[in-house]
């Protein structure tokens, strides 16, 4: 779709599940999006960094969302590897 200036714009950009790489549809009301922020260990305040994970409803229905979040957090270095 084009706007008045002739630039291509998207009306809807679908999210993808971080665990299974499936597209999260607009009607998937069981899906969740978690944002984990970096915290300064001395002050306990939020820094500028953050990581966002989107989990689709199918993963949550199977009861695998906690394992998927731990796996993704280990891969990104948020949780230690021997957790």
UniProtKB/Swiss-Prot annotation:
One cellular component (GO) term of this entry: ribosome
Key words of the record: Cytoplasm, Developmental protein, Endoplasmic reticulum, Ribonucleoprotein, Ribosomal protein, rRNA processing, Translation regulation
MF terms (GO), sorted A to Z: ribosome binding; structural constituent of ribosome
Pfam families recorded: Ribosomal_S21e (PF01249)
Top-level lineage group: Eukaryota
PROSITE patterns found in the cross-reference section: RIBOSOMAL_S21E
Biological-process GO terms, alphabetical: lymph gland development; regulation of cell population proliferation; regulation of translation; rRNA processing; translation
Bridged cysteine pairs (disulfide): none
Localization per Swiss-Prot or TrEMBL: Cytoplasm, Cytosol; Cytoplasm; Rough endoplasmic reticulum
Its job: May be an associated component of the ribosome rather than a core structural subunit. May act as a translation initiation factor. Has a role in regulation of cell proliferation in the hematopoietic organs and the imaginal disks of larva.
Assembly, per entry: Component of the 40S small ribosomal subunit. Interacts with sta.
Protein family per UniProt: Belongs to the eukaryotic ribosomal protein eS21 family.
Name used for this protein in its record: Small ribosomal subunit protein eS21
Source species: Drosophila simulans
């Amino acid at each position: 779709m084009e706007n008045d200036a002739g630039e291509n714009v998207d009306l809807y950009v679908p999210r993808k599940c971080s665990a299974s790489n499936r597209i999260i549809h607009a009607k998937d009301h069981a899906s969740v999006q978690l944002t984990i922020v970096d915290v300064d260990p001395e002050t306990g305040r939020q820094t500028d960094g953050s990581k966002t994970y989107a989990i689709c409803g199918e993963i949550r229905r199977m009861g695998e969302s906690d394992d998927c979040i731990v796996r993704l957090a280990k891969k990104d270095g948020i949780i230690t590897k021997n957790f």
